[in-house]
């Protein structure tokens, strides 16, 4: 079985970053809520306790039984985790005289200790805490300090138990990855053999054993996750996988034909379904974003169910669920409040009474892309920007008509094509155009016009949880605006969205 690091989540915004940094070392790890920790077995090589927005001084502060891990496994507490270990061991945690948030420099670094091996004195780290450890038990040893924090890191003498007040998972901690390597590789003894190649080999074997000769149906979206999931399952069961790709009339220009051809070249058995009329009919008169999402989701389930019933003896539904979806559903805070409902597959398993197979549900997005590369999937698929399940329906503010879709498809096509031509596409996490529900006055050919306004959006992000708007060159934006207004009939004004997430979301609806 695969060896792993167990990360116990106390609600920190950075917990997923810890997991990503550990996995970048080719070491498998899992995140579990602190109050739903799994039983320790022989595969667990070490435990990391995350940060938290809580204080160990609070009456109902998140707590665990440290005896389950101490002196049994290497243990690393990060920020709140470090304070928790110290507090429960008899140390004193108090509010900081000044809240330390941002960059700090380590001093008095014990580089002789395995945790700080090759960490340079004066190394920059990232702090984010309101409490601080002011007294440590007699069997604790301070490993480093900062100008304002005496106990920036410590070790329990005679144990592989450590605490650090800073966040090594954040890129502002310049040697954070090295420190995590010291813990995971040198102290925990992980062998660094969790690679995309190893994942593919193991997953295909597991899928063969799990599915056997049963048939699987999978809905393709043209995106990375469903595509990689399909190829993995296909490698395991071959023609017993049938994929369904639905044209809901809300895709980008030429997308249906291009993606369908790509899938067929990949050797997948794909059924293409032209359902534009059904989707447009279900969206008639709807302008509320949530109502549009739900209508699209309901229609997708109907279409997918109809097509699936044409395939005899299907037992499994394949899905491209990835690890952040799983983490969110079992997070410390519980499932998040619904900001936007998921567009399609939510009702499928119940309606179709199929067993679920999710081969990517342990992977982050960047890992899915690396696995796709290992599988030989073309960059046209792997490097595609995320595209919302409801498609252009949530980029057309207000009601949906075929005419509006056609206008937005042309605008989007120009924007994306020029990003690719100028070498900017791969620098952007996600880009697209939005048709606004307003018109503006303009002048074209000495005549007054009163036509549509479109917004362009381009953001950078690691995982879509947060995002910054991209500073596209002014000349590029000027050229794009000019081309859109001249080529797309019905548009006389172009604006550029310079909002970050939060407070805005990436999509407008």
From Swiss-Prot:
Record keywords: ATP-binding, Glutamine amidotransferase, GMP biosynthesis, Ligase, Nucleotide-binding, Purine biosynthesis
EC number: 6.3.5.2
Signal peptide: none
GO CC list: cytosol
Record-listed ATP binding positions: 221-227
One MF annotation (Gene Ontology) recorded for this entry: GMP synthase activity
Domain Glutamine amidotransferase type-1: from-to ranges: 4-193
Keyword Nucleotide-binding: yes
Boundaries of every GMPS ATP-PPase domain copy: 194-384
Residues forming the catalytic site: 79 (nucleophile), 167, 169
Residues passing through the membrane, by range: none
Pathway entry: Purine metabolism; GMP biosynthesis; GMP from XMP (L-Gln route): step 1/1
Catalytic activity: XMP + L-glutamine + ATP + H2O = GMP + L-glutamate + AMP + diphosphate + 2 H(+)
Domain of life of the source: Bacteria
NCBIfam families per the UniProt record, alphabetical: guaA_Cterm, guaA_Nterm, PRK00074.1
Subunit structure: Homodimer.
HAMAP family found in the cross-reference section: GMP_synthase
Purpose of the protein: Catalyzes the synthesis of GMP from XMP.
Protein name, UniProt field: GMP synthase [glutamine-hydrolyzing]
Name of the gene this protein is made from: guaA
């Amino acid at each position: 079985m695969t060896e792993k690091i167990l990360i116990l989540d106390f609600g920190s915004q950075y917990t997923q970053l810890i997991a990503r940094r550990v996995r970048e070392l080719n070491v498998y790890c899992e995140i579990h809520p602190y109050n739903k920790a799994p039983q320790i077995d022989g595969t667990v090589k070490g435990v990391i306790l995350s940060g938290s927005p809580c204080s160990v001084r609070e009456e109902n502060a998140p707590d665990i039984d440290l005896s389950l891990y101490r002196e049994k496994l290497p243990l690393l507490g990060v920020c709140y985790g470090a304070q928790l270990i110290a507090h429960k061991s008899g140390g004193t945690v108090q509010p900081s005289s000044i809240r330390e948030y941002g960059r700090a420099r380590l001093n008095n670094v014990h580089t002789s200790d395995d945790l700080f091996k090759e960490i340079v004195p004066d190394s920059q780290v990232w702090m984010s805490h309101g409490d601080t450890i002011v007294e440590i038990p007699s069997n604790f040893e301070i490993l480093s300090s900062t100008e304002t924090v005496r106990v920036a890191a410590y070790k329990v003498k005679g144990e592989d138990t450590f605490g650090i007040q800073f966040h090594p998972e954040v890129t502002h901690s310049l040697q954070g990855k090295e420190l995590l390597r010291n813990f995971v590789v040198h102290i925990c003894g992980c062998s660094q053999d969790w690679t995309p190649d190893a994942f593919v080999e193991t997953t295909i074997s597991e899928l063969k054993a799990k599915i056997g000769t049963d048939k699987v149906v999978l809905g393709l979206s043209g995106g990375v996750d469903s595509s990689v999931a399909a190829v993995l399952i296909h490698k395991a069961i071959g023609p017993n996988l049938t994929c369904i790709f639905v044209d809901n009339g809300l895709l980008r220009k030429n997308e249906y034909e291009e993606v369908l051809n790509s899938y067929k070249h990949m050797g997948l058995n794909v059924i293409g379904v032209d359902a534009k009329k059904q989707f447009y009919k279900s969206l008639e008169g709807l302008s509320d974003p949530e109502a549009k999402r739900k209508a699209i989701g309901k229609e997708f389930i109907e279409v997918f169910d109809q097509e699936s019933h044409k395939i005899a003896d299907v037992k499994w539904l394949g899905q491209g669920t990835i690890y952040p979806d799983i983490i969110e559903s079992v997070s410390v805070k519980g499932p998040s409040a619904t900001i936007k409902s998921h567009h399609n597959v939510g009702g499928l398993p119940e309606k179709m009474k199929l067993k679920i197979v999710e081969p990517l549900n342990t992977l982050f997005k960047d890992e899915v892309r690396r696995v796709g590369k290992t599988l030989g999937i073309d960059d046209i698929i792997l490097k595609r920007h995320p595209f919302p399940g409801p498609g252009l329906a949530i980029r057309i503010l207000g009601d949906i008509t075929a005419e509006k879709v056609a206008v937005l498809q042309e605008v989007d096509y120009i924007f994306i094509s020029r990003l690719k031509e100028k070498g900017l596409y791969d620098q952007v996490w996600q880009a697209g155009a939005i048709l606004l529900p307003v018109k503006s006055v303009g002048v074209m050919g000495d005549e007054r016009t009163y036509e549509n306004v479109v917004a362009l959006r381009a953001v950078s992000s690691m995982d879509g949880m947060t995002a910054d708007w991209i500073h596209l060159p002014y000349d590029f934006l000027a050229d794009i605006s000019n081309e859109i207004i001249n080529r797309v009939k019905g548009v006389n004004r172009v604006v550029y969205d310079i909002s970050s997430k939060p407070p805005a979301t990436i999509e407008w609806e």
